[in-house]
From Swiss-Prot:
GO terms for MF: ditrans,polycis-undecaprenyl-diphosphate synthase [(2E,6E)-farnesyl-diphosphate specific] activity; magnesium ion binding; manganese ion binding
Species lineage: Bacteria, Bacillati, Bacillota, Clostridia, Eubacteriales
Catalytic-site annotation from UniProt: D33, N81 (proton acceptor)
Family: Belongs to the UPP synthase family.
Name of the gene this protein is made from: uppS
InterPro entries: UPP_synth-like, UPP_synth-like_CS, UPP_synth-like_sf
Function field: Catalyzes the condensation of isopentenyl diphosphate (IPP) with allylic pyrophosphates generating different type of terpenoids.
Cofactor binding description: Binds 2 magnesium ions per subunit.
Official protein name in the record: Isoprenyl transferase
GO biological process assignments: polyprenol biosynthetic process
Swiss-Prot/TrEMBL keywords: Magnesium, Metal-binding, Transferase
Amino acid sequence: MLNFIRSDKDKGKGNDNDINFSNIPKHIAIIMDGNGRWAKKRNLPRTMGHKAGGEALKRIVRECSDIGVKYLTVYGFSTENWIRPKEEVNAIMRLIVEFLKREFNELNKNNVIINPIGNILGLPEACITALNDAKNKTKNNTGLMLNLALNYGGRDEILNAVKNIFASYEENKISKDEIFNLSDEEFSSYLYTGCIPDPDIIIRPSGEKRLSNFLLWQCAYSEFWYSNINWPDFSIEDLHTAIKDYQNRDRRFGGVK
């Protein structure tokens, strides 16, 4: 596995020795919350908070890749976020394109798979083009899969899956009996996340303690970890703290031990 080169800002942060590398979560999901609060505390425009959030994403992707996380899913823009001021939405869309252009070479060099999930066709054309380009160019990589949840909503995802099942029935690709006997795993294959394993832990910074329509089907047995730190300030050390907490939990999946 190729390692990212940490910037001077990130060197020395976190303590790898505190992590049990035999029990690294396979799939980490993060609700990247608190960009606006971060900017407000500094009397900056909200767009500056979103830009700083991109820097946080960059360092967390690096660290997840380095320590052996297989899947990282980040909630970047929800189906409900369209109600925000138009200028903020437009700025977020520009930042998505800029992030992909700026970071693509390093991500690709380090074997990262870029996988957008959500109603991607509902995004502006420039975003669609940038996302599809990054996806196609990294699809044969074998390292960390970075799932970018954009124009994503858990309810929308489940409803879309049901529609896709019905469409498959109409096209004689699946029978009525097969629909009635669908397993959890088979239904999951119709979701935006496809056959990606469910998240082991969902992290939410900013102090909020709710799912906000994120991975509603997939989070059935996920562990949750909350922090009062706003996303732009989320550090490698904070990631390690969340992982160590996860490693100390007793996951029973409905059973007993």
